[in-house]
């Protein structure tokens, strides 16, 4: 039996679905969704924790046995992201950080130059860095070379629900990566999550697709099943695509 655990740096997780917390209507709805998802690792925007105290969310994650993964959401440059990561380390007593360095508010796309700069500084400072990046195989390689513990390419821009708009690039990132690849951003529904795993990703990170769904808990359960199905399909090996039909049973 193939080991189904997700291993990043020195930690292993039974679930390959990483959840975000943004967009949830309230903590009760979020709790139901987190339980249904089976996630063991959930992102927390450190700015929101600072601004709102964050005790309710952090207490919820602690009660559910879910590891919080602080992120630098909203940061617009390397210096700001590094400072936010350092604050997160002090506040949550963890050296894990989901690194986000955004170029602008309209697209929410990563700023490649500032992202690599921040990643290098944080790795040197002892962080386990998980960077949110563009679907660019070259940039993914640069981030891995900088010492990142995983690379997290987007499927499409944050919150768009467009799914994976450039699957070939995701496949190229997977083929060239020596660290786990986590599809991050753009997931709209369960089939998108399954496709990410079929393309070879090691995990999927999503938030909006669940927190803003009509029934967040039901969608979380669907996403969990989709990630598992996609992972198993990838391991099983799909049949090759053919131009012409081929009978499944030999002719008499």
UniProtKB/Swiss-Prot annotation:
<dbReference type="InterPro" id="IPR013785">
    <property type="entry name" value="Aldolase_TIM"/>
</dbReference>
<feature type="binding site">
    <location>
        <begin position="185"/>
        <end position="186"/>
    </location>
    <ligand>
        <name>1-deoxy-D-xylulose 5-phosphate</name>
    </ligand>
</feature>
<comment type="function">
    <text>Catalyzes the rearrangement of 1-deoxy-D-xylulose 5-phosphate (DXP) to produce the thiazole phosphate moiety of thiamine. Sulfur is provided by the thiocarboxylate moiety of the carrier protein ThiS. In vitro, sulfur can be provided by H(2)S.</text>
</comment>
<feature type="binding site">
    <location>
        <begin position="207"/>
        <end position="208"/>
    </location>
    <ligand>
        <name>1-deoxy-D-xylulose 5-phosphate</name>
    </ligand>
</feature>
<keyword id="KW-0784">Thiamine biosynthesis</keyword>
<dbReference type="GO" id="GO:1990107">
    <property type="term" value="F:thiazole synthase activity"/>
</dbReference>
<dbReference type="GO" id="GO:0009229">
    <property type="term" value="P:thiamine diphosphate biosynthetic process"/>
</dbReference>
<comment type="subunit">
    <text>Homotetramer. Forms heterodimers with either ThiH or ThiS.</text>
</comment>
<comment type="pathway">
    <text>Cofactor biosynthesis; thiamine diphosphate biosynthesis.</text>
</comment>
<dbReference type="InterPro" id="IPR008867">
    <property type="entry name" value="ThiG"/>
</dbReference>
<dbReference type="Pfam" id="PF05690">
    <property type="entry name" value="ThiG"/>
</dbReference>
<keyword id="KW-0963">Cytoplasm</keyword>
<keyword id="KW-0704">Schiff base</keyword>
<protein>
    <recommendedName>
        <fullName>Thiazole synthase</fullName>
        <ecNumber>2.8.1.10</ecNumber>
    </recommendedName>
</protein>
<feature type="binding site">
    <location>
        <position position="159"/>
    </location>
    <ligand>
        <name>1-deoxy-D-xylulose 5-phosphate</name>
    </ligand>
</feature>
<comment type="similarity">
    <text>Belongs to the ThiG family.</text>
</comment>
<dbReference type="GO" id="GO:0005737">
    <property type="term" value="C:cytoplasm"/>
</dbReference>
<dbReference type="InterPro" id="IPR033983">
    <property type="entry name" value="Thiazole_synthase_ThiG"/>
</dbReference>
<keyword id="KW-0808">Transferase</keyword>
<feature type="active site" description="Schiff-base intermediate with DXP">
    <location>
        <position position="98"/>
    </location>
</feature>
């Amino acid at each position: 039996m193939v080991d189904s655990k997700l291993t990043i740096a020195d930690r292993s997780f039974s679930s390959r679905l990483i959840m975000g917390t943004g967009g949830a209507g309230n903590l009760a709805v979020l709790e139901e969704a987190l339980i249904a998802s089976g996630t063991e690792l959930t992102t927390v925007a450190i700015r929101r924790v600072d601004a709102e105290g964050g005790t309710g969310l952090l207490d919820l994650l602690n009660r559910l046995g879910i590891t919080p993964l602080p992120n630098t959401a909203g940061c617009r440059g390397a210096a700001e992201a590094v400072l936010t990561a350092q604050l997160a380390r002090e506040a949550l007593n963890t050296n894990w950080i989901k690194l986000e360095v955004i170029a602008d508010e309209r697209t929410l796309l990563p700023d490649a130059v500032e992202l690599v700069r921040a990643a290098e500084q944080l790795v040197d400072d002892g962080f386990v860095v998980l960077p949110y990046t563009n679907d660019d195989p070259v940039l993914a390689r640069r981030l891995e070379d900088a010492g990142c513990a995983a690379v997290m390419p987007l499927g499409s821009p944050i919150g768009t629900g467009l799914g994976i708009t450039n699957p070939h690039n995701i496949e190229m990132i997977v083929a060239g990566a020596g660290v786990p690849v986590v599809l991050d951003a753009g997931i709209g529904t369960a089939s998108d999550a399954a496709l990410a795993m079929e393309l070879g990703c090691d995990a999927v990170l999503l938030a909006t697709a669940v927190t803003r769904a009509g029934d967040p808990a039901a969608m979380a359960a669907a996403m969990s099943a989709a990630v598992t199905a996609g992972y198993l399909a990838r391991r099983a090996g799909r049949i090759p695509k053919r131009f012409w039909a081929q009978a499944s049973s030999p002719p008499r």
